[in-house]
UniProtKB/Swiss-Prot annotation:
Belongs to the Thz kinase family. The keyword Metal-binding applies. It catalyses: 5-(2-hydroxyethyl)-4-methylthiazole + ATP = 4-methyl-5-(2-phosphooxyethyl)-thiazole + ADP + H(+). CDD domains: THZ_kinase. InterPro entries: Hyethyz_kinase (IPR000417), Ribokinase-like (IPR029056). Pathway: Cofactor biosynthesis; thiamine diphosphate biosynthesis; 4-methyl-5-(2-phosphoethyl)-thiazole from 5-(2-hydroxyethyl)-4-methylthiazole: step 1/1. Catalyzes the phosphorylation of the hydroxyl group of 4-methyl-5-beta-hydroxyethylthiazole (THZ). ATP binds at K115, T168. This is Hydroxyethylthiazole kinase 2. Keywords: ATP-binding, Kinase, Magnesium, Metal-binding, Nucleotide-binding, Thiamine biosynthesis, Transferase.
Amino acid sequence: MEIRQNVKFKKPLIHYITNPISINDCANMILAAGAKPIMAEHPLEVSEITSASKSLGVNIGNITDNKMKSMLISGKTAYENKIPQVIDLVGVGCSKLRLDYAKKFISECHPNVIKGNMSEIKAIYGIKSSAKGIDVGACDIITEQNFDENIEMIKRLSMETGSVVAATGVVDIISNGTYTYIISNGCEMLSMITGTGCMLTGIIASYISSGNILEGTALAIVLMGICGELSQHVKGTGSFRNELIDNIFSISDDIIIKKIRINSY
């Protein structure tokens, strides 16, 4: 839990270029995690902003020409200055434009973390997926039958890119090619409001800011899953969203340790 406490103490500046659908919730989630967000996306300022930040997050959920340009500028700046960065492959299987752009970003910016659902991870790896827009396709959901196969694919993608790969879903798989974690926390309501994946990327960006990439990514995913479980008692999705942010802000280390469900593979 040292990573979490360091973020709360140091309050690192996190540069997050995300989509307008979830930008407000993402900024609030970064604040709840203990860091400070800046959501700048103008091409003429993003290099300067990234250089002054401790971590970078980019999200391709709602791309525009300017945003695509800005993310590449920031990604290259982060790589050149050894600033940790994470790319969220939102809807990467939706279009050739997104897929080609994501591949270009990964090859030129070398993000420390590549995050997506299993449909998105399969698409970036080059395997046909059954994505439904930004949602994971039914055929891509991790099951007992395809569990080992998917883990091997995630490990290969990690080794090929040099990035930690985080595949999120009913079961979350995080790997750096050598060490692999399986996380089973979470709840269905996390998939019933828009932007929870984008919010998670903001927490990942916050927790990898110290340079502890694999453990920071895993801790962020564990935290979101547990806080989802703690928030699901509410009467509806609007209340769930607010409760989720509150729990990210207030949860104790003792509760995380008590409720964590993580295994090494």
